[in-house]
């Protein structure tokens, strides 16, 4: 068995070669916490090894983010740094790859004025709209991944000391990403091929709608837009580069019709959003719009999150993940959406991935007419349970079991 350092290099190689599939002469931006600098350097090494033209580092720091929200002048939260906009727009226009390493303290912004967070999110969302649209349309290769930080590891394993918690979280992350000492890239390709089998079956059924029910109170009907398709595993950029946007991933996803979601959906796991924990929550929707929001913890944060703009009150993603999946079977609550969403079926409120055939040649107005939701935000939340039932309704009215007892029926 390889030691942890060798496995970390295998993981970096996986992200560069399979997550982003870096091409010779292509630039790479790594958006990364300063605490993760050693791993970012491994990723840079691997990128240059396959012919990357230049690696650009975009650092961030939990501590500095927190004290900015606490002590900066109030007007700062209605402004955005133009250099950030210029960087995002420039590299996305040229088709550079973008690696985002998410490893934040789940409660870093606990106690921060939520109005400052909301205003900052709004101004940033508007300024980075062009970049976000390019990302959602897969106009450039992008990948989201995570590695442990001490604050995050202690949140996941509070019973362990810091070193033991870090070691345990590394083990679980590598396991979820199928980095096991063998050929990590080959392992990932095999997994991606398995996801594609379910993608094909769902696309062949071409359901008109899905009906969700379970014992914790979910009773939701989700209409799917005409011409929708399911995706999962790998994606293809505008330049024809195949990449994996999330590592790990267990999901198969599409978009709901913007005005076609009705009923009640109950979250099955806490949500970590903007450095705050939201727990025990549910939504009621009518004609696609969230009309009621309830949460046992963080209700004000959740209300702000789903009202940052008009589109935030509508769903933009429906994703299927078997309850019997490796991350779910670990029994670990990661307080990190990248991992927790891959332990559970989930939805997202806000921006939709335009999973509509021919979407690349459609205008925003044409996409809206087809039922695609637009927003400056996209927030995943988990709804899967061991008894979740999902029934697909075909265009001729037939009911086909999609999920039985939390996992695929086919």
Where are these regions (language model features)?
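Active-site bordering "gate/hinge" segments
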Residues: 1-262, 398, 408-410
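Short conserved micro-motifs at the rims of enzyme active sites and ligand-binding pockets
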Residues: 111, 155-157, 277, 305, ...
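Short polybasic amphipathic segments
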Residues: 209-212, 281-284, 291, 386-394
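Short linear motifs in exposed loops
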Residues: 223, 293-294, 403
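Long, well-ordered mid-to-C-terminal structural blocks that present hydrophobic/aromatic surfaces
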Residues: 252-310
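A structural signal for short secondary-structure junctions
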Residues: 258-259, 274-277, 284-285, 309-313, ...
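Dual-mode signal for accessory low-complexity, basic/Gly-rich regions
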Residues: 292-361
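Extended hydrophobic packing segments that form well-structured cores
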Residues: 366-410
